A protein has these predicted regions:
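Short C-terminal domain-edge/linker segments immediately following a structured domain
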Residues: 82, 114-115, 131-132
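ABC transporter nucleotide-binding domains
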Residues: 1-84, 89-103, 107-109
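Conserved beta-strand-loop-alpha-helix hinge in the C-terminal portion
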Residues: 106-127
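Short amphipathic alpha-helix segments
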Residues: 129-137
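Short, charged/polar low-complexity linear motifs in solvent-exposed/disordered segments
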Residues: 58-59, 70, 114, 126-128
Length: 137
């Protein structure tokens, strides 16, 4: 495998927002830049599917936004499907169309984002024997 020409590498670096790093060594990159570099390396093989393990873990709020926008951009422009493992459910809710829940190394439930949202709505259901008494409450 590999990249046949440097133009491909430049295109990938531009895609992930690392085109202007010059000769800066990766060890001197910020955590967000390292996350984007990891995604760039994975993109070198032109995948249709990428697995990301805690891609925003440890990032500052701006870094989280940048990684989220990159994932959405790659999904939309390159039609790449992502499998993301994360404990940050709020962030997943901004990205995911489907969820899988794992317990003991096994998927115990799969659900669409729409169905998950419906099942998580807060509501109270009350049943009363006397609506007149309830009206006085």
């Amino acid at each position: 495998m590999g990249i046949p020409d440097s133009g491909g590498a430049e295109e990938i670096l531009k895609l992930v927002g690392l085109e202007n790093t010059g000769k800066k060594k990766a060890k001197n990159f910020s955590l967000g830049m390292k996350q984007r570099l990891g995604i760039a390396v994975a993109l070198a093989g032109s995948p249709d599917f990428l697995v990301l393990d805690e891609p925003v873990n440890g990032l500052d709020p701006q870094g989280i936004i940048e990684i989220r926008e990159l994932i959405l951009k790659l999904n939309k422009e390159k039609q790449i499907t992502f499998l993301i493992s994360s404990h940050i459910l709020d962030e997943l809710s901004r990205l995911a169309t489907h969820y899988g829940f794992i317990d003991g190394g096994r998927i115990v439930r799969e659900i669409s984002a729409e169905d998950l949202e419906k099942s998580c709505r807060k509501c109270v259901r009350a049943q009363v024997s006397s609506t007149k008494a309830l009206a006085k409450v």
